[in-house]
């Protein structure tokens, strides 16, 4: 075949007019059966690398703009009824998701490279791996240096819970609870929704939904309880499958038998079903006892202050457990990347 000629996949019609039409469409990137998975893997990989080298500040301009938008809508529509929460959720989520999807579509029509860079940027802004890991790392370092007061101070800054006179074991336990949930919401949940056909719009949908469920449910003078109901329910549905896939990943890369046992028998000890799956499986995978509180649902802080006793799997939490948690999360990240790479290779050779 001459250099520069269009080579069509086998199985396409061979008529002269049909071949010319398909060649033109392939040249214009209108038919791209293989580029999407390839873009997904490499954009996630590059975004992870960039995020590790240069962590995104929580006060970055994009988040500040979104936060202003979300709070403005909430302030204007919160009239104390659930239907107002639905309208507010749609008014915040739809514009951002549609704009991200439209920009991706337009860039892809212009250049595959531009679309790829847009994907990397979106994943980078939605991941937030380092937005919580620095708290975890600082607590770990403080405990390794026997600086318990400093560890209490950092934990309080991160979670807002009362850490006065908190013993080391409790500091580690609270840190693990928040780290397990945060690793899912900032990494694996974003992965799942980005890999779906929605692509960057899916990642934005997950990140915004998580923020609205958390932010709008925070008590405040200008916030009613009914207003946040839809946001919490919407995120519960959106996070149902990802949370269970993350729990399965923890089980695969950790103590599988204990993780599955805890998942099956102790999930209900946690008030939020999705977080319960994560924390029960994470507890078993780590071999660490995490308490299962009976507190107000959908509150991450409430998960950490219950008094119903530890799960009947694993050992007491110690500073060494924090290092085990780091290994567990990174092994789970590698597992997800391997699966995505296998999908990419399968599409390549098909």
Could you describe each region identified by the protein language model?
Residues 14, 18, 27-30:
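Short hydrophobic alpha-helical segments enriched in small aliphatic residues
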Residues 33-350:
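Hydrophobic N-terminal alpha-helices or hydrophobic patches in metabolic proteins across all domains
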């Amino acid at each position: 075949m001459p250099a520069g000629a269009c080579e069509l996949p086998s199985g396409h019609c061979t008529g002269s007019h049909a071949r010319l039409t398909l060649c033109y469409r392939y040249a214009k990137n209108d038919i791209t059966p293989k580029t999407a998975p390839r873009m997904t893997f490499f954009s996630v990989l590059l975004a992870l690398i960039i995020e590790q080298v240069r962590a995104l500040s929580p006060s970055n301009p994009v988040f500040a703009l979104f936060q202003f938008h979300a709070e403005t809508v909430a302030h204007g529509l919160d009239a104390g009824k659930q239907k107002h929460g639905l309208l507010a959720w749609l008014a915040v989520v739809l514009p951002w998701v549609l704009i991200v999807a439209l920009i991706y579509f337009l860039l892809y029509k212009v250049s595959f490279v531009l679309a790829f860079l847009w994907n990397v940027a979106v994943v980078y802004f939605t991941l937030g791996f380092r937005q919580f890991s620095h708290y975890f790392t600082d607590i770990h370092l403080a405990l390794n240096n026997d600086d318990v007061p400093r560890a209490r101070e950092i934990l309080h800054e991160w979670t807002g819970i009362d850490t006065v006179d908190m013993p080391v074991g409790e500091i580690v336990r609270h840190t693990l609870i928040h780290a397990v949930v945060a690793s899912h919401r900032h990494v694996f949940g974003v992965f799942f929704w980005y890999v779906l056909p929605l692509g960057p719009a899916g990642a934005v949908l997950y990140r915004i939904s998580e923020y609205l469920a958390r932010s709008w449910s925070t008590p405040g003078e200008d916030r009613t309880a009914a207003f946040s109901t839809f946001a919490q329910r919407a995120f519960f549905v959106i996070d149902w499958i990802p949370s269970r896939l993350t729990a399965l990943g923890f089980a695969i890369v950790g103590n599988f038998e204990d993780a599955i046992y805890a998942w099956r028998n102790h999930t209900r000890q946690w008030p939020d079903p999705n977080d319960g799956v994560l924390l029960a499986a994470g507890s078993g995978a780590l071999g660490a006892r995490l308490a299962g509180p009976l507190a107000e649902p959908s509150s991450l802080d409430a998960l950490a202050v219950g008094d119903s006793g530890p799960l009947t799997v694993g050992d007491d939490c110690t500073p060494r457990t924090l290092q085990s948690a780091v290994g567990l999360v990174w092994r789970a990240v590698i597992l997800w990347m391997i699966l995505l790479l296998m999908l990419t290779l399968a599409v390549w050779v098909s």
